[in-house]
A protein has these predicted regions:
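Extended, small-residue-rich solenoid/repeat segments and analogous flexible loops
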Residues: 1-35, 181-190
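C-terminal/domain-terminus segments
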Residues: 44, 127-178
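Hydrophobic transmembrane signal anchors and adjacent membrane-proximal interface regions, especially
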Residues: 2-6, 116-121, 139, 184
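Short secondary-structure boundary/capping segments
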Residues: 8, 14, 74, 105, ...
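Flexible, glycine/small-residue-enriched loop-and-beta-strand segment within the central core
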Residues: 20, 25-32, 37-127, 158-168
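Short, highly charged low-complexity linear segments
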Residues: 16-17, 95-98, 138-144, 175-190
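Generic hydrophobic, helix-prone segments enriched in Leu/Val/Ile
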Residues: 8-9, 14-15, 23, 41, ...
Length: 190
């Protein structure tokens, strides 16, 4: 059975499916691949460069904020409620932690976040500034990720609990692209 999407391409970008309540601020700073779905109630704040690969799904109630760059590779997904922070106040010591006070009283840590190709981030997970999620890694629901994650690992928070089958996954992607007649490199260069 074929799934039907009731989407609006309110941003008029080929290969991007958005919905009525998708909110993207700074869309001119975003580079899109193809075959991307960004659900209702997603909020993306693109003050700096954001790159979203091809065949990426960003589920409802996800937010990407913080004022620094973010990338997510091909065939990756952010499940419902994921929070990507590329910037965060330092709540330790004597700093005030909110944007209503002058910058001189705050200590904001900003750093790019990178999620590699073939990754999955589980529902309600939090990825903090400066984190790189290696190619093929998956993060369990409800995780808080504060450190870089190695490729092809299965993680609960920062703790590795297993390995994914890299060869099988890459074979599946190759078969998908062959069966559908898609060429990932060409679609990413558009």
């Amino acid at each position: 059975m074929t799934q039907t999407f009731r989407h609006l391409n309110k941003y008029n970008i080929p290969g991007l499916r958005t919905f009525e309540y998708t909110k993207i601020v700074g869309i001119e700073n975003i580079e899109f691949g193809t075959n991307i779905i960004i659900d209702d109630f997603v909020f993306i704040y693109a003050k700096k460069k954001i790159k979203i690969g091809s065949y990426v799904h960003i589920a409802s109630f996800t937010s990407i904020t913080g004022g620094e760059s973010f990338t997510i590779g091909d065939f990756s997904g952010l499940s419902s409620g994921v929070r990507i922070f590329t910037g965060s106040d330092d709540f330790t010591g004597c700093h005030l932690g909110n944007p209503t006070v002058d910058e001189k009283y705050r200590n904001v840590h900003r750093a790019p976040v990178h999620i590699g190709r073939y990754c999955g981030i589980g529902a309600n997970s939090v990825i903090l500034p400066g984190v790189t999620v290696g190619e093929g890694a998956v993060v369990a629901a409800g995780s808080v990720v504060t450190k870089n994650l190695e490729p092809w690992g299965i993680y609960v928070g920062n703790r590795k609990i297993g390995e994914k089958d890299k060869v099988a996954i890459l074979n599946n992607i190759e078969n998908f692209l062959l069966e559908t007649g898609k060429n990932l490199e060409k679609s990413n260069n558009k």
